[in-house]
């Protein structure tokens, strides 16, 4: 999980080239109650971070490249450097990576985290809805992403949640990414604006009209948009199967 192929460059956990928010603003505290902060102990024993989001009381959705030896999820957080009264810290019982995940091509970059216990749903901890399996977001639509990643190539990761509004791009805008697949991925962020997810933001959501349509996956190692997000609608049947224990 080192060097997100930003992925290895852009969206891995912060130490691995993961993404953060560039060109955004600090989110209003607890305005995104589905957001999850992932503290990851890698297979090598180092510490990384990713984002994720709560889709059921006992399940967090994130990117497969955020896998690790051990993961602790913090829900209800705004400033992850503090022990806020709203926070719920829950260890991950099981990491469920899509069986077709390909780290070389950055495809099927999706993972479900089953928590050791159900989260208590509160005004600051809540789930976010997913799209239907046939729901595609059209190019030109404006959506949001959020995370605790870096705010610049040479900047540290953010301790407070940040957010940025991004434009959904036509697939041609991501043609520089050799293995980009429109059916399974979303091209996000105009190349004319320095706004994107960046290192440390990996696994966070792409939010369109209150629905999670994407997962931060990878992009340019220097944080230049567009970036690639996993298209959630393509995986809705798999997600439902895992959550329902089938």
From Swiss-Prot:
Would you indicate the residue range of the signal peptide?
1-18
Taxonomically, which superkingdom?
Answer: Eukaryota
User: Does Disulfide bond show up as a keyword for this record?
Assistant: yes
- The organism encoding this protein is Mus musculus
Q: Where in the cell is it found?
A: Secreted; Cytoplasmic granule
Know the name of this protein? Mast cell protease 1
Output one GO MF annotation.
serine-type endopeptidase activity
Q: EC number(s)? A: 3.4.21.-
- Disulphide bridges in this chain? 50-66, 143-208, 174-187
- Tissues and organs where the protein is expressed, per its UniProt entry: Mucosal mast cells.
Q: List the active site.
A: 65 (charge relay system), 109 (charge relay system), 202 (charge relay system)
* Residue intervals of the Peptidase S1 domain: 21-244
For this UniProt record, the keywords arranged alphabetically read as follows: Disulfide bond, Glycoprotein, Hydrolase, Protease, Secreted, Serine protease, Signal, Zymogen
Cite the SUPFAM superfamilies for this sequence: Trypsin-like serine proteases (SSF50494)
Entries under InterPro entries matching the protein: Peptidase_S1_PA, Peptidase_S1_PA_chymotrypsin, Peptidase_S1A, Trypsin_dom, TRYPSIN_HIS, TRYPSIN_SER
Which stretches are tagged as propeptide in the UniProt entry?
Answer: 19-20
Return the similarity comment: Belongs to the peptidase S1 family. Granzyme subfamily.
